[in-house]
């Protein structure tokens, strides 16, 4: 009789979410390490990514689809992207801006890729900020991002 091996899948949603986010972070780290080895900066990578979107009409299409509420739509997009990586995200709205606090995990529990590819959490965080800021800029939206310890705070302004 042939013996079958049963793979145990995580039954805990949090465990699955953590595995997903660490996998995504690991892939981003390998991209950053490869780019660094090729002599590229974070801005070089970000510019290339957004140029590809620009050339293919992404920004024009996004602005057309979201013309009624571009800032609100961007806030939703920003939060969805952050939710792929982080479990705790807080959104506050003031008269002139949205404030998004994202509690990051990689400072306290860095994945192994940080070590093996010699990328530190601050470098990862800087890249993620530059990527989001450039995306917003190309959509005509102003955003500032600051990082203190394990909380990233994004200020997304309602008016340019």
UniProtKB/Swiss-Prot annotation:
This is Uncharacterized protein YxnB. The lineage of its organism: Bacteria, Bacillati, Bacillota, Bacilli, Bacillales. The gene is yxnB.
